[in-house]
């Protein structure tokens, strides 16, 4: 029994010694681990701010960017449009701001509604249509005279003989230099405008190359020349010698009125353009639409047959002239748009006689030229 007790005693002591040794070793190992993995105090302080800086520099993918606001004015074709009948439509927007960015509103859609610049007459009356973009806005007075043609013909003659559209307002008294390098070519219609313009200088130093009775056929076939600096000259020579950069044309009314000259209308344009561009290859050419004629009968529906025929032909040839201008790299300015009454004739307030415009008509013409000049300066194009 003594040997057994001694053996047990020895085993107990050995076990206790092993436990103590393990505890000491474990304690030493634990200190060593903390020393190797924990960074020095200075290193830890340096790492944390770097992490914060990176977080601040990261872009916020959810933040919304401000839309770019475009420069330029809103340009409408007219300051006033009066439809003849319910159901008529018209696009009054020119630019320069893209159409899809412009907001449109009608004060009374039951009279005239508007969508993306297109007006629709929906009822009889008068209202206002507004276009806006960013901090810019512009308005147009719009209306409609009648629901049926029968009701339209019952209206006062002065209403039916008034212009369907008025040009945008322009301060003609403000000095203008846009036309200082421009010329305008025409017949007696243009010559009368020259007489009024020379009293006001509303078109600056524009050069007038006008001669009464002339025509496309007369100039192209050398039957009549242009006066330049007091002497007769071929048109292409006058343009070259003047050094102008831009030439407006209002020619063709005498051609439209003559059956034989009508047949040569665009052939004569071909001849004139070829000659002009041969001597002045960089000159800009703008074709102005021909104008309707006036009839002073008491009722518009009783327009004289020859005037009705001419005005119908004018519409046809103006449409072809617009297409011709586009195909031949020329600008096109629709002056007739502003001169017509509700029956497609020259408005009563603009006529001097059946063919020529008075001072009011010429002032409207000058407003149109000035307005479209501003439009071009801001990036618009004539077409």
List each language-model region with its residue ranges:
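A short helix->loop->beta-strand "cap" motif at the edges of active sites that frequently abuts
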Residues: 280-284
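Conserved SGNH/GDSL esterase-like catalytic core that processes O-acyl groups on lipids
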Residues: 172-267
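Extracytoplasmic soluble-region selector
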Residues: 36, 63-153
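Catalytic His-Asp segment of secreted/periplasmic serine-dependent ester chemistry enzymes
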Residues: 293-383
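N-terminal secretory signal peptides that target proteins for export/translocation
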Residues: 1-12
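Sec-dependent N-terminal signal peptides of Gram-positive bacterial secreted proteins and lipoproteins
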Residues: 10-35
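Second-shell loop/turn segments in exported
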Residues: 222-225, 254-263, 273, 305-311, ...
């Amino acid at each position: 029994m003594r040997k057994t007790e001694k053996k047990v005693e020895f085993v107990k002591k050995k076990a206790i010694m092993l436990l103590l040794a393990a505890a000491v070793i474990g304690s030493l190992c634990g200190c060593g681990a903390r020393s190797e993995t924990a960074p020095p105090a200075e290193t830890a302080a340096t790492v944390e701010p770097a992490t914060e800086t990176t977080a601040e520099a990261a872009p916020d993918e959810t933040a919304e960017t401000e839309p770019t606001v475009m420069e330029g004015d809103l340009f409408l074709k007219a300051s006033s449009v009066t439809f003849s009948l319910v159901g008529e439509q018209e696009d009054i927007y020119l630019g320069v701001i893209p159409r899809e960015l412009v907001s449109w509103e009608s004060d009374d859609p039951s009279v005239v509604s508007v969508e993306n610049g297109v007006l629709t007459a929906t009822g009889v009356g008068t209202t206002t249509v507004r276009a806006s973009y960013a901090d810019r806005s512009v308005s147009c007075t719009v209306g409609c005279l009648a629901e049926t043609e029968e009701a339209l013909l019952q209206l006062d003659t002065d209403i039916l003989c008034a212009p369907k559209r008025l040009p945008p307002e322009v301060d003609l008294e403000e000095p203008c230099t846009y036309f200082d390098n421009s010329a305008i070519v025409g017949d007696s219609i243009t010559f009368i405008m020259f007489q009024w313009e020379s009293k006001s200088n509303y078109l600056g130093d524009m050069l007038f190359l006008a001669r009464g009775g002339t025509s496309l056929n007369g100039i192209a076939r050398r039957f009549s020349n242009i006066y330049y600096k007091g002497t007769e000259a071929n048109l292409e020579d006058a343009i070259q010698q003047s050094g102008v950069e831009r030439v407006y044309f209002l020619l063709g009314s005498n051609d439209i009125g003559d059956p034989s000259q009508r047949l040569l209308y665009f052939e004569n344009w071909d001849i004139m353009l070829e000659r002009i561009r041969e001597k002045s290859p960089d000159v800009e050419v703008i074709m102005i639409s021909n104008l309707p004629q006036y009839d002073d009968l008491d009722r518009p529906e009783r327009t004289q047959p020859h005037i009705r025929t001419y005005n119908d032909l004018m519409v046809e040839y103006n449409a072809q002239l617009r297409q011709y201008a586009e195909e031949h790299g020329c600008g096109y300015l629709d002056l007739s748009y502003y001169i017509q009454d509700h029956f497609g004739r020259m408005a009563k307030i603009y006529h001097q006689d059946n063919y020529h415009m008075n001072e009011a008509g010429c002032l409207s013409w000058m407003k149109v030229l000035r307005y479209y000049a501003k439009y071009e300066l801001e990036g618009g194009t004539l077409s």
